[in-house]
Amino acid sequence: MLCGLICAGHPQAEGVWLAEVEPVFPQGDLLAEAATRQCLADLNDLAKRTRAGIEGPEIGLRVLLPTEEAPLRERAEAVYDWCRGFLYALGLAGVGERDLSGDTREVFRDLSDITRLDLGDLDEGEENEAALAEIVEFLRVAAMLFHKERVAAREWA
């Protein structure tokens, strides 16, 4: 979701994202309040690193997904969830398919297609591993393409 908000050019991307994911603990519980402060600090750090990866001079975005040691199904479900979050964020930022150029419109449709995949019969295997690796790389490039079109192009104009 955070990547989608940043790539869509939402002016308050981090704040909107934090409002969606911020943990809520009972007030008056000092341990919970300390945990909340630490969690928020960690989330803010993640937001800064994500923005730096997207906006930095090098292609440094790292899509936050389970490691390759995780089962294939778990990683595929995380990709599915990442795509849903990215598309949800575009909607929050007011970006629809009609607002996109040909390339990003195609990427938008591809991301949407990923959210409709049936992961129920996904088998472990080299072919599926290779396909998932390609999709993960596609996500990274897709996010950068959205940012280039929605944000960077306006900054350079």
Model-derived segments and spans:
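Domain-length accessory/inserted modules outside core catalytic folds
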Residues: 1-83, 87-157
